[in-house]
């Protein structure tokens, strides 16, 4: 179970990074549209 917990931790970090990029792109579009 120790290896599975470690693998789940990095996976969450990678997903957060992808969400950060999508949130930044959406914020730019809202600024450009406004």
From Swiss-Prot:
GO terms for molecular function: DNA binding. It comes from the Eukaryota. Testis. GO terms for cellular component: nucleosome; nucleus. Keywords: Chromosome, Developmental protein, Differentiation, DNA condensation, DNA-binding, Nucleosome core, Nucleus, Spermatogenesis. It is found in: Nucleus; Chromosome. GO terms for biological process: cell differentiation; chromosome condensation; spermatogenesis. Residues 1-34 are annotated as: Disordered. Protamines substitute for histones in the chromatin of sperm during the haploid phase of spermatogenesis. They compact sperm DNA into a highly condensed, stable and inactive complex. This is Protamine. It comes from Dicentrarchus labrax (European seabass).
